[in-house]
């Protein structure tokens, strides 16, 4: 496994993070550029997204925590300062969804998903450095979510609200999503930062929130017929249950496992491990003979989205390494290695750095979507490298 760990460190440092340090830093307006397109062209006046900037903060904080290189701390601090100065809403709490290239608020809605990623980034910075201000911001954002976005009546987290935390008509994260008031994706990216915050701020209040989120996954989001996680719901948790998202399934399998491990409750861990193994089995329906994992299955009409998106491969690799590490199942190690071989051959851009967005159904590289941008960040692939470097498997 040492060879795999060495490969991951090389990819992390010389293919991913180096790209962000040399290509994406915005020296004129601060922080990082909002977009570098699929042909590596910088768009200096592109809007800057909260999710992208919070993920940059997380990635460089985590890289510094593990590798202790000063340039990673410098980049993490740059991202922290930018989110602090331009995205935090000092009047109403939470963070803005986007700012323009000069840092002026653009879309001021409160997307719970984005606030979750800000918690993830600030808590990781605190974890890596011991910085009290970063921890205080993460805690404050946690309280913002619990105060404004948690629906106690229906037990779930509201997808989005206005800047002032009032109801909003269009709650979608992106044009690709259904306009549901409850989504699996947002709940996944709340339990993920809450778990990370718990590592540095172990309080009964936060533990209660995390345990409740696990219950929401097992009682509301999990389709107990298929063991896929369903994606879109209304306030009362009614949903079409018509899409199977393999990448989200395998990502959830290891993130929920991580949550149970961090909580340290053996009874709960045993319960969650049974479930996450079945979720991972369901996700494996997306595996293909070339080692990759395809994107989605739409049960209406039995159609498949066969593109191989970069992030799905990352989560596929972590998820199967997690299964191998804890349950010693050799076939899961082989799945992870096979998927990595696919990534190295098709998605990783060895010439220009970073990874392509996807390989399309016809086998060509997707260069229409970004190398760095609103939804393309050094998060999934950096995390994959760091997980494989840090884990004992």
Which residues does each predicted region cover?
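Glycan-recognition and catalytic cores of secretory/periplasmic carbohydrate-active enzymes
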Residues: 1-393
């Amino acid at each position: 496994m040492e060879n795999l760990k060495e490969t991951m460190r090389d990819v992390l440092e010389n293919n991913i993070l180096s790209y962000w340090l040399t290509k994406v830093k915005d020296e004129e307006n601060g922080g990082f550029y909002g977009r570098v397109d699929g042909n590596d062209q910088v768009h200096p006046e592109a809007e800057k997204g909260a999710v992208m900037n919070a993920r940059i903060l997380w990635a460089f904080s985590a890289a510094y925590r593990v590798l202790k290189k000063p340039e990673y701390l410098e980049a993490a601090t740059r991202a922290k300062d930018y989110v602090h100065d331009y995205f935090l809403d000092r009047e109403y709490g939470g963070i803005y969804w986007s700012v323009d290239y000069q840092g002026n608020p653009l879309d001021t809605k409160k997307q719970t998903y984005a606030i979750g990623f800000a918690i993830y980034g600030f808590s990781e910075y605190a974890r890596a450095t011991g910085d009290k201000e970063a921890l205080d911001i993460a805690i404050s954002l946690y309280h913002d979510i619990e105060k404004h976005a948690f629906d106690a009546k229906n037990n779930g987290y509201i997808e989005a609200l206005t800047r002032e935390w009032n109801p909003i008509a269009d709650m979608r994260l992106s044009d690709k999503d259904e306009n549901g008031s409850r989504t699996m994706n947002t709940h996944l990216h709340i339990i993920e930062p809450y778990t990370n915050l718990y590592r540095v701020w172990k309080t009964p209040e936060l533990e209660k929130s995390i345990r409740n989120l696990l219950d929401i996954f097992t009682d509301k989001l999990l389709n107990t017929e298929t063991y896929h996680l369903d994606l879109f719901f209304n306030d009362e948790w009614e949903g079409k249950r018509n899409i199977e998202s393999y990448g989200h399934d395998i990502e959830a399998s290891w993130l929920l496992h991580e949550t149970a491990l961090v909580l340290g409750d053996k009874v709960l861990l045993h319960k969650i491990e049974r479930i996450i193994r079945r979720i991972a089995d369901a996700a494996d329906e997306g595996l293909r003979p070339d080692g990759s994992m395809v994107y989605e299955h739409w049960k209406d009409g039995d159609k498949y989205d066969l593109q191989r998106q970069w992030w799905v491969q990352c989560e596929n690799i972590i998820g199967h390494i997690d299964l191998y590490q804890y349950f010693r199942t050799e076939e899961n190690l082989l799945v992870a290695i096979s998927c990595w071989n696919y990534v190295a051959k098709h998605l990783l851009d060895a010439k220009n750095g970073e990874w392509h967005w996807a390989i399309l159904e016809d086998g060509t590289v997707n260069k229409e979507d970004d190398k760095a941008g609103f939804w393309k960040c050094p998060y999934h692939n950096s995390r994959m490298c760091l997980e494989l470097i840090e884990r004992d498997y």
